[in-house]
Amino acid sequence: MEIKVLHQVMEWNEDVSAEVRRTLKDHKVCLINVMGSPGAGKTSLITALIAKLREEFAIGVIEGDITGQIDAEKIAALKIPAVQLNTDGACHIEAMSIQHILPDFDLDSLDVLFVENIGNLVCPAEFDIGENLRITVLSIPEGDDKVAKYPPVSYTHLTLPTT
């Protein structure tokens, strides 16, 4: 007997991510999933994008971490709605977590919602969270082989800025 647990988890996540995508579409919110290794510059990229976009777009941020709220506090200091999402050890954010946290935002007053995913190049790339765009931040000190070593970060993402 073969039990395909991972397959079932992925199918379930796809169903929930489709619901998240529909909800955000109904509210005209663009969800941007920002991924990268710890220290690659995800928070720095998001704060730079906030500085460039805030005059034209209403922005919110979901800060994903295993624990703590350091990055969420940095974003909140910019007067941007920010909600901390701690995974308590999980290496990625799933669509269900996004679905549960959306009511913490006034979606009718947002245009763009950034999700700073967990600092990891492996797991987050495998999970659709209902995003419209995926950005992976790669840093030069990590080496030039990340795309070759972690193919999902390159074939599932539209943008690969390097810090």
Where in this protein do the model-derived segments appear?
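Nucleotide-state-sensitive switch-loop elements of NTP-binding domains
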Residues: L6-E19, V29, L49, L53-D128
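Structural motif
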Residues: L31, F114, I135-V137
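Hydrophobic anchor at the beta1->P-loop junction of P-loop NTPases
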Residues: V34
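The conserved Walker
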Residues: P38
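Conserved lysine of the Walker
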Residues: K42
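Hydrophobic positions on the alpha1 helix immediately C-terminal to the Walker A/P-loop
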Residues: L45
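Conserved Switch II/interswitch segment of TRAFAC-class P-loop GTPases
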Residues: G130-A148
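Conserved small/polar residues in nucleotide/adenosyl-binding loops
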Residues: T156-T162
